Amino acid sequence: IGFGRIGQEVAKRAIGLGMNVLAHDKYTSEANITLNFFNGDKKTFTIESTSLKNVLKGSDFVTLHIPKLEDKAVIGAEEIGLMKDGAGIINTARGGVIDEDALMFALDKGKLAYAALDVFTNEPNPSIHLMMHNNISLTPHIGAATLEAQDRIGEELAEKIIAYFNK
């Protein structure tokens, strides 16, 4: 859910692992995902965006790569209810995108098998219930702290400045 740069990178890895990828994005109707193999071969897959409902109903793994734009969670009890029994959800997007109470309820009742979170509604201190739950894996949101990520941010900023002054 969310099929921009990060969502497409996750899709690339999922396809490489043999998974069928479903995507939902308000702004991207389709994307071409190219896998580069060790022998120089390339294979491109076109992934078309579908409805949120289709993604939730059809996925064993749901990953979130969306901004937090509203006060309401994007994934709440209703959305979790659409998900496959035993599915898992991964949020590396923003805290508050998932209703944590609805998530805990679904995990406790066995609707969902697991959750992986590196962002929380109450950052930097997730609730004790999240931290202690056996079916939730928590990690710090530090993906942008790598040297490669910082280099990419610098390059993107420089490109935007150059593009601005070339207008």
Summary of predicted features, one role per range:
Residues I1-G4:
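Glycine-rich Rossmann-fold phosphate-binding loop(s) that bind the pyrophosphate
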Residues G7-Q8:
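N-terminal Rossmann-fold NAD(P) dinucleotide-binding loop
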Residues A11, I15, L107-D108, M131:
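Gly/Ala-rich phosphate-binding loop of Rossmann-like dinucleotide-binding domains
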Residues G16-N20:
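Residues at the starts of beta-strands that form the adenosine-phosphate
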Residues V21-D25:
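Short beta-strand "acidic-cap" motif of Rossmann-like dinucleotide-binding folds
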Residues K26-I128:
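Rossmann-like adenosine-cofactor binding region
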Residues N39-K43, Y114, V119-K167:
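C-terminal helix-to-coil terminal segments
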